[in-house]
Regions:
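Short, solvent-exposed aromatic-acidic interface loops
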Residues: 83-88, 109-115
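A short, structured loop/turn motif at beta-sheet edges
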Residues: 15-16, 43-46, 70-75, 95-105
Length: 150
């Protein structure tokens, strides 16, 4: 069983800058409070094949996550797939679109899939993610605009 959530937001910064901000996974804790720590391999610029390893806290439980970048087209999109075998895993991405006035539309989406016992939990996870999606988009906007000064 699986389900998807998504959010769209307009950021008052140029698409190239927003793409670079989102591609640097070290920024994830700025807008995703569930991310406790994150590392990248190899170091350097994010590219196809880059792996991000993170510790996240969901429903009071800490788990390790490992995501591989499987699609990367600056400044248009980023795609990832989770390689870790947790009860609920994610794959998704960002779509970015340049807007007039040096602004950017960002769409984030994730498909969550349950494995084993996670098949019983994925509905709750998707419901919570959908409920939080608009706020998640606003957190991305606020973090990117605060980090990327005009």
């Amino acid at each position: 069983m699986s389900g998807q959530f998504e959010a769209s937001v307009e950021i008052d910064r140029p698409v190239e800058a927003v793409f670079a901000y989102l591609a640097d996974g070290h920024n994830d804790p700025d807008f995703s409070p569930r991310v406790q720590e994150i590392s990248k391999s190899p170091e350097g610029r994010t590219a196809l094949g880059t792996v991000f390893r993170s510790t996240v806290k969901d429903a009071g439980m800490k788990t390790g996550r490992e995501f591989r970048i499987v699609g990367f087209d600056p400044p248009h999109f980023i795609r990832w797939t989770e390689q870790s075998r947790n009860l609920v895993t994610a794959e998704g991405g960002y779509d970015l679109e340049a807007l007039p006035g040096g602004r950017t539309r960002v769409r984030i989406f994730n498909t969550l899939e349950g494995h084993g016992l996670g098949k019983l939990l994925v509905g709750f996870a998707v419901g919570a993610a959908r409920k939080d999606a608009p706020a998640f988009g606003r957190r991305i906007k606020a973090a990117a605009e605060a980090s990327l000064k005009r």
